[in-house]
Amino acid sequence: MKGIYSALLVSFDKDGNINEKGLREIIRHNIDVCKIDGLYVGGSTGENFMLSTDEKKRIFEIAMDEAKGQVKLIAQVGSVNLKEAVELAKFTTDLGYDAISAVTPFYYKFDFNEIKHYYETIINSVDNKLIIYSIPFLTGVNMSIEQFAELFENDKIIGVKFTAADFYLLERMRKAFPDKLIFAGFDEMMLPATVLGVDGAIGSTFNVNGIRARQIFEAAQKGDIETALEVQHVTNDLITDILNNGLYQTIKLILQEQGVDAGYCRQPMKEATEEMIEKAKEINKKYF
């Protein structure tokens, strides 16, 4: 399960419907061009939390079909609706996903006992493995190393997608849980995360920048920090330009420039303006 995983983008048409042809093209681009090890399906990058249960299921089906067993697949099934999370966990396990993942329950201020109950309910409903999706800056849920340890007592909870900038906590977790998978979740921090011993990374920009992501990861693992830093500098220049132009819209526009029907974002995300489109063309030309 280790390696470089793209947090899969989803193509929508102008009316917000899933564009199956475009989604399949994004999946093939990730596998054939970006050379990723796996796909993280149904996460923030997939605009998941704006989708119906049926739409989520269809995306999971398309990804499984189009990946053709060539890469590992992780299904993000987490939801503030626990019944939906369990339903999606069962659905994706039956489809054959290699693991499931679940974001910490958000919006309401759940205490840790409620969070633990949430994870145990999901993983105990299926014969599969679970990766915790920790993204405190969006969920407001910050868990301590002691709380992670309590969750990891369940052998079916095999790791965490660590989307945070707390490198002290990351280092403490690496030391405390040598047998658990830790995936870096911030693309712009891959080098320091790799030096601290993560097992891989899951990122939105890998949909276009997967090759550089692997270069950083492999160079840092070999101790070639100079090369890794050089590629991280270029990557972070790219990420800065993307963020300044609109994250998901710009990644999709770059893919469009590369011949992939990446489509539109789901409302209430805004449609790309002419200025954003022109800037994305410049970004594509500059970095690819």
Swiss-Prot record:
- Statement: the UniProt record of this protein carries the keyword Transferase: no
Its protein name is N-acetylneuraminate lyase
Q: Indicate the residues that form the catalytic site.
A: Y133 (proton donor), K161 (schiff-base intermediate with substrate)
Question: What family is it from?
Answer: Belongs to the DapA family. NanA subfamily.
Instruction: Give the record's GO CC terms.
Output: cytosol
EC number(s)?
4.1.3.3
Major location category of this protein: cytoplasm
Describe, as the record does, how this protein assembles with itself and its partners: Homotetramer.
Organism, as annotated: Clostridium perfringens (strain SM101 / Type A)
Its annotated pathway reads: Amino-sugar metabolism; N-acetylneuraminate degradation; D-fructose 6-phosphate from N-acetylneuraminate: step 1/5
Single GO term (MF)? N-acetylneuraminate lyase activity
Q: Domain of life, per the record?
A: Bacteria
InterPro entries assigned: Aldolase_TIM, DapA-like, NanA, Schiff_base-form_aldolases_AS, Schiff_base-form_aldolases_CS
Q: Looking at its record, which EC class is this enzyme?
A: lyase
